[in-house]
């Protein structure tokens, strides 16, 4: 059921049997995210997970990550790297790096982009 849920949430329902080489760049990105979310790991690292996605897919993927990391039945922590300020609203905490060093750690509502 988790597989079906995650595939639906990232917009990949119906693509289960398609060969990967036939998928578009955005579809491959969504499939990669789905695989990470389904993996039963306690921690996942996502580097620019919405980079190749359209606006609708970006929102769905980020909401799915938020939902799965908020599920108290199976703890999942996700660290995602982004340059998109609007994605911060999905985070529980924001760490800002400057020149390779941690310069701040705070709640998303208190973060100010410089």
Feature-to-residue mapping (PLM):
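Helix N-cap at the start of a conserved alpha-helix in ABC-type nucleotide-binding domains
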Residues: 55-57
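Catalytic Walker B motif of ABC-type/P-loop ATPase nucleotide-binding domains
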Residues: 44-48
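Conserved ABC ATPase "signature" region
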Residues: 1-15
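ABC ATPase nucleotide-binding domain "signature motif"
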Residues: 24-30
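Hydrophobic anchor residue at the start of the ABC signature
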Residues: 33
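Conserved beta-strand-loop-alpha-helix hinge in the C-terminal portion
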Residues: 101-114
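Conserved ABC ATPase signature
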Residues: 19-23
């Amino acid at each position: 059921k988790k597989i079906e849920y995650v595939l639906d949430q990232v917009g990949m329902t119906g693509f289960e049997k398609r060969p990967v080489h036939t998928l578009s760049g955005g579809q491959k990105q969504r499939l990669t995210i789905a695989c990470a979310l389904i993996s039963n790991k306690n921690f996942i690292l996502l580097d620019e997970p919405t980079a190749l996605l359209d606006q609708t897919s970006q929102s769905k993927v980020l909401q799915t990550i938020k939902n799965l990391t908020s599920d108290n039945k199976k703890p999942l922590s996700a660290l995602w790297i982004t340059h998109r300020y609007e994605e911060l609203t999905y985070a529980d905490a924001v760490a800002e790096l400057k020149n390779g060093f941690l310069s701040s750690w705070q709640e998303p509502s208190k973060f100010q982009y410089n």
